[in-house]
UniProtKB/Swiss-Prot annotation:
It catalyses: Endonucleolytic cleavage to 5'-phosphomonoester. Residues 69-199 are annotated as: As active as intact RNase H. It is an enzyme of class 3 (hydrolase). PROSITE patterns: RNASE_H_1. Its cofactor is Mn(2+); Mg(2+); Co(2+); Ni(2+). Belongs to the RNase H family. GO terms for molecular function: DNA binding; exonuclease activity; metal ion binding; RNA binding; RNA-DNA hybrid ribonuclease activity. Mn(2+) 1 binds at residues 75, 115, 139. Changing residue 40 to A: No loss of RNase H activity. Divalent cations; Mn(2+) and Mg(2+) are preferred over Co(2+) or Ni(2+). Divalent cations are required for folding and substrate-binding, while divalent cations and NaCl are required for maximal protein stability. Changing residue 179 to A/W: No loss of RNase H activity. This is Ribonuclease HI.
Length: 199
């Protein structure tokens, strides 16, 4: 679910020009709702939360010049390995600003399964925003080595997730993946653990 930090009045004007329908917010924090194509947005003071089957129906309107390169940080967490698991991801623009972030539980999984699910969530979010190039950064050496083909992927479930990640990567003009220390991946790690704490 993309979160777009933007000027809400400008975003509403762009959506109105594109033919979106609007309704009032459901709480004191929600300013308004908008529907366009197969996407639904909820407006807050300085951001839009976009949902639906095709978030780009809205994100492409409010951020028409997105393109470019994004840095995607991802992390998976599992308590019990296997056990309750969650993912966290953060998209950072070239100028260092956070474009979007998310964290969600994924049920019962191993740590490696959660890492792959976090990677896939980050790739899907970056695709929804329409970025051309992606630089992936995660603290799982296994995911990095398997994704690049340096290591075999013997586990059938991880192999399926690797195939899905590679399919998503074909939607980008260029991509790379870098193994980073946990401290560098702190925000994605925190989002995954917050999702587990809130479950």
């Amino acid at each position: 679910m993309p979160v777009v930090e933007c000027d809400i009045q400008t975003a509403r004007a762009a959506l109105a020009d594109a033919g979106a329908s609007f309704s009032d917010g459901n709480s004191e924090h929600e300013l308004w709702h908008a529907d366009l194509g197969d996407a639904h947005a909820v407006a807050y003071a300085d951001k839009l939360v976009v949902q639906g089957g095709s978030p780009t129906d809205i994100t492409a309107v409010v951020q028409p010049d997105r393109g470019g390169r994004v840095h995607a940080y991802f992390d998976g967490a599992s308590r019990g390995n296997p056990g309750p698991a969650a993912v966290g991801w953060v998209l950072v623009s070239g100028d260092g600003g956070i474009v979007a972030e998310g964290g969600d539980t994924i049920g019962r999984a191993t740590n490696n399964q959660a890492e792959y699910d976090a990677l896939i969530a980050a790739l899907e979010a970056a695709a929804d925003f329409g970025f051309d190039d992606i630089e992936l950064r995660g603290d799982s050496q296994l995911v990095e080595k398997q994704l690049t083909g340096a290591w075999d992927t013997n586990d059938p479930d991880l192999r399926r997730k690797r195939v899905r990640a590679r399919e998503l990567l074909t939607g980008f003009d260029d991509w790379s993946i870098t193994h980073v220390p946990r401290a560098t991946n702190e925000r994605a790690d925190a989002l995954a653990n917050e999702a587990l704490d809130d479950a």
